[in-house]
Amino acid sequence: PDDAGLAARYAVRRIADSARGFPCRVSLRDAAVGEELLLVPYWHQPAASPYRACGPVFIRRGAMPARLAANAVPPYVAQRLVSVRAYDHADCLVAAEVMEGVQVGAWLGSQLDDPGIAYAHLHSARHGCYLCHAGRALR
């Protein structure tokens, strides 16, 4: 879509001007300098709870969905300060922290070991972009 079409959808086009700072929600990696992205609103928490939320996400042009192995944390998470939020089965927040991305894997492991935790969301702690959803691997 052209810029007017994007604006009608509350979205804007951006060109990455640094190697970090443009995390693609689809490919789960940072855009390279010069890559085109869309910055769009995304209902990352569509649950019928007080925590229902929409926030900004970047999507790289031509991005392919990432496929991660069980217990893997996207590499772009390790490179930033992250806000982590754990939710229960009623989609209510029960735990939250801000931490360096290299600590996220251990935090998720401890949270998801608790049967009362249903899933977690990761956000960029500085700019608030939604990074990804974390849940238990299907068996």
Language model: regions and residue ranges:
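N-terminal, charged amphipathic alpha-helical interaction modules
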Residues: 1-72
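Short solvent-exposed loop/turn micro-motifs enriched in small/polar/acidic residues
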Residues: 22, 77, 113-115
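Short, solvent-exposed amphipathic alpha-helical segments in soluble enzyme
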Residues: 54, 75, 136-139
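An N-terminal amphipathic alpha-helical segment
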Residues: 57-95
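Short, hydrophobic/π-rich interface segment
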Residues: 83-119, 123, 136-138
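Short Gly/Ser/Thr- and Asp/Glu-enriched loop/turn motifs at secondary-structure junctions
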Residues: 124-129
